[in-house]
């Protein structure tokens, strides 16, 4: 039996169909929406022997069978400006906020730095776990710190940018501290003036065309590009784009480039080149290919 505090609204045998972007009707033994830190600590403390599954936007998970234990849906809400001067603003965002909605909030306020991360699915709390990034921008570029709760002993801990050990789509929360902490909020620093626009990707530059380059036009261009590549999860269940662009050494890059001249790629550091996973998928004719009930979108 699940240990429960009767003040907490814990659901039993709860369908996760509307809690994952594949829309799979898999049930969880127990389900609870976390709306404040007190409830989070209480429910963790009372269920130390249970398997805990932390669920955000449900876009990075594939349910295949009945989910044993307790599923915690992060519902912590709130956006607060905690520091501000003429040029910059520091914002604290709770983990349960929708990432894309938060990006649009920032764009509408004239705060720059994450407009390239428009329409990335999921919640704010998941953003540091894999250091989300797109079109030349990563979360670490604006990240200050995140607050966490330890699943085992319910202690709170803050990790600054350096201690998050960010890498290409990774962090300590995905490696050495996987399943140890629940991220409850993040702090980021954005610009109010003298924004540094990034339209280095050809598709973004092409989509903007002759429009004025600003926060709105970049965000709108990226939203349009993303929508053209991926189906609406309400129409066709999917997990979005999760492929990492392969990083290879210089020798390998030029060998492949000579053999496949159309292969896109660019230098990221000494002796390291990044090539396009999207190009590889299409070149190898996996775009639109299905095997059984699993497929790559056309």
What are these regions (language model features)?
Residues 1-152:
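Anion-binding (especially nucleotide phosphate/pyrophosphate-binding) glycine-rich loop
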Residues 11-12, 17-21, 156-298:
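Phosphate/pyrophosphate- and phosphate-bearing ligand-binding catalytic cores of soluble enzymes
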């Amino acid at each position: 039996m699940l240990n429960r505090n009767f003040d907490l609204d814990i659901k039993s045998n709860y369908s996760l169909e509307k809690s994952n972007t594949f829309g799979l009707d898999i049930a969880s033994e127990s389900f609870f929406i976390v709306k404040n830190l007190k409830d989070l600590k209480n429910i963790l403390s009372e269920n130390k022997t249970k398997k805990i599954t932390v669920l955000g936007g449900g876009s990075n998970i594939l349910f295949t069978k009945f989910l044993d234990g307790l599923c915690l849906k992060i519902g912590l809400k709130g956006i607060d400006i905690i520091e501000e001067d003429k040029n910059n603003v520091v914002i604290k965002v709770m983990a349960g906020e929708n990432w894309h909605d938060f990006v649009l909030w920032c764009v509408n306020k004239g705060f720059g730095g994450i407009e390239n991360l428009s329409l990335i699915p999921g919640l704010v709390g998941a953003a540091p776990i894999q250091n989300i990034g797109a079109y030349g921008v990563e979360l670490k570029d604006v990240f200050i710190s995140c607050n966490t709760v330890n699943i085992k002993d319910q202690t709170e801990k803050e990790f600054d940018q350096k201690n998050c050990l960010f890498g290409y789509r990774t962090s300590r929360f995905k490696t050495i501290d996987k399943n140890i902490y629940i991220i409850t909020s993040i702090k980021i620093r954005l610009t109010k003036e003298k924004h540094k626009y990034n339209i280095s990707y050809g598709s973004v530059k092409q989509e903007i065309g002759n429009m004025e380059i600003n926060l709105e036009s970049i965000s709108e261009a990226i939203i349009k590009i993303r929508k053209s590549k991926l189906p609406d999860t309400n129409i066709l269940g999917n997990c979005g784009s999760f492929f990492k662009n392969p990083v290879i050494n210089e020798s390998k890059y030029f060998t492949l480039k000579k053999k496949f001249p159309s292969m896109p790629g660019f230098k990221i550091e000494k002796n390291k080149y990044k090539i396009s996973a999207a190009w590889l998928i299409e070149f190898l004719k996996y775009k639109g290919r299905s095997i059984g009930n699993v497929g790559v979108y056309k």
